[in-house]
Amino acid sequence: MTSPSPHRFHRHPAAPWAELRDSARSPHCFRLHMHAEYSIGIVDAGRTVFHHAHGPQPVEAGGVVLIEPGAWHACNPDPGAPWSYRMLFVDADWLHARLGVAALRFPRRTLTDADIASLVDGLCRPVDGTAAADRLALGLEHLLDRCAQPAALPLPGDAAALAPALQRLHAGPDAGLTVQSLAQECGMSATRFIRRFKAATGMTPGSYRLNLRINGARRLLATGAALSEAAYAMGFADQAHLQRAFKAHHALTPGCYARGA
């Protein structure tokens, strides 16, 4: 008999710009990955090691994690020691429009302040209607006023020289792009392009593109698309290919994600 998933996902039509992940006593580990959304999380029990550009950092129960879109990271528990956490994903375009900014950055990606933890705890709860969605939006403004700063560009790192390749990748991650073609877009050799790309984003071009495709499939699944449709739309060879990649990056199958379990 299959064990129930420790992961739950909460989405509501009143807040289409937000999604909540609630993971209880999860032993699962993640590969380095990134999200298209802002990620705001709190550890409820246990501890995790937060791998990111300025890490790794241990985060204990009550600790808060803040992650910008496109920032590579992974949060993994100690071996044999499950942890519980909640993570709120907020659509970047919606948030930028609401706050009137091009992008946001978090000067500190981990916080242990009790007031901040209490605020994030209140934000990381399921939305059940319009009133709750309005409270969530106002709470986000309050949190970001304290913890975020406006940024000029939403591109990760010193990526100006890589902008042509990044634009191509984001415009069509499902297309048959090669390292050579992306390097030519930036006027670089393939070797130099890979080195510069990894220094700016924390990932190889191939890993970055795979993340974009997985995130694209995730968005489609959240709107009710069939697994086969999401796999085809994002350029995966078949459903099994998407399932393997999705589970490695999100610690659950795309089917479980679509069902919210």
Regions found by a protein language model. Give the residues of each.
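Basic/polar phosphate-binding segments, predominantly the helix-turn-helix DNA-binding elements
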Residues: 170, 175-212, 231-260
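N-terminal regulatory/effector-sensing and dimerization cores
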Residues: 3-104
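Flexible coil/turn residues that form the inter-helical turn or adjacent wing/linker of helix-turn-helix
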Residues: 175, 223-225
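Jelly-roll (double-stranded beta-helix
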Residues: 4-8, 29-31, 104-107, 130, ...
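Short, Lys/Arg-enriched, Trp-marked, Pro/Gly-tolerant hinge/linker segments that flank
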Residues: 102-117, 121-186, 199-211
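Short, amphipathic alpha-helical "recognition" segments used to contact nucleic acids or chromatin
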Residues: 218
